[in-house]
Amino acid sequence: MKIIADSGSTKCTWLVTDGVHTSEYRTRGINAVQHSPEQIREALAELPPCGPVEAVYFYGAGCGGTFPEATEKMVRELRAHFGTGRIEAETDLLGAARALFGRGEGVACILGTGSNSCWCRGGEIVENVPPLGYVLGDEGSGAALGRNLVNGIFKGHIPLREEFLAAHGLTYEEIILRVYREPYANRFLAPFAPFVHAYLD
C-alpha cells in the first residue's frame, strides 16, 4: 500500500493505493510549522485504518528544506502512525509542481488558504519567492483576501458592512476575538473570499 497526501493548512487529501485500487480520503489540514505533534496526531486519527503501508509521500504546508525541524516532526508523526520506514515529507508546492509537470518544466502555483508559486524543472523546485504566510504575505490567498476585505469594510473603504455582517452572521467584536484570541486566524479569514467575488462590481 502506498499513500500520497496533499495538505494545506485547511484540508488534506489522502490517496491510498495498492497499485490496482485507489481510495481518496480527506482530513483537516496539517501545517507542520503551525501544528503541534498532538494536533498532527488528531488529524491522522481521522483516517480509516489502512493495510500494511509500504511508503508515504506527504506534500504539506510547512514541510520541506526551508523548515527542517517541522519536516522532521512531520516524518516522526507519520512514521508513528503508519509504522513504515519509507516516509517522505516535502512542501505542498513541490507536490503541485510534480503533479503538474512530472519531470518537465514550468511554473506551478498554489492558491488556497495560503498562496505560493515556483519555477520547477526535473521534478524539483529551482526558483521560489517565499510566500511569508498570511500575516506577512500570501498575496492572493483566501486568507489575504479575507484580511483585506475585513480591513476595508471596517475602515469604511468598502461600503458593504451590513451585507458582510449579515452574510456571515458575525459582529465586529466576534471577528476581532476570532482573529486575535483563537488559533487559525488564516482558516477563519479565508472563507470570506467568495464574498469578494460576489461583489466584484
Positions of predicted regions on the chain:
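Glycine-rich phosphate-binding loop plus the immediately following alpha-helix
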Residues: 125-169
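Short beta-strand-loop/turn "lid" adjacent to the catalytic site in phosphate-handling enzymes
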Residues: 49-89, 100-102, 182
